[in-house]
A protein has these predicted regions:
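A short, N-terminal "cap"/entry segment at the start of jelly-roll beta-barrel domains
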Residues: 1-10
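Conserved short histidine dyad/triad with adjacent acidic residue
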Residues: 9-27, 61-62
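Short, conserved beta-strand element in jelly-roll/cupin
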Residues: 18, 27-42
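A generic structural motif
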Residues: 43-45, 69
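Short acidic-glycine-tyrosine-enriched beta hairpin
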Residues: 46-62
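Ligand-binding loop in jelly-roll beta-barrel domains
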Residues: 62-85
Length: 89
């Protein structure tokens, strides 16, 4: 659930939640997260994993690709910054 988005669309914050599952992700944005409840695993494209539990705080950088694995229903606070992409014009 999104709580705020800036008028230019570059900044947003809210609460995300998901039931158990596993899916591929690719981030064009920088995302700060704090896990409010649950357990998930973030897998990067090189096969590294990070176990995420209640109270964990972390940043997913723009350009990250990998997958989210939700092991137990997970809720997180997110803060997203979407950088402006230079079109070269």
């Amino acid at each position: 659930r999104n709580h705020y988005s800036s008028p230019d669309g570059q900044f947003s914050t809210g609460i995300w939640e998901a039931e158990p599952g596993h899916w591929t992700v690719s981030y064009s944005e920088h995302e700060y997260c704090e896990i409010l409840e649950g357990e998930s695993v973030l897998h990067d494209a090189d096969g590294n994993t990070r176990l995420l539990r209640t109270g964990d705080r972390f940043v997913i950088p723009a350009g990250f690709s990998g997958s989210w694995e939700v092991r137990e229903r997970t809720r997180k606070v997110y803060v997203i910054y979407e950088p402006v992409v230079d079109s070269g014009a």
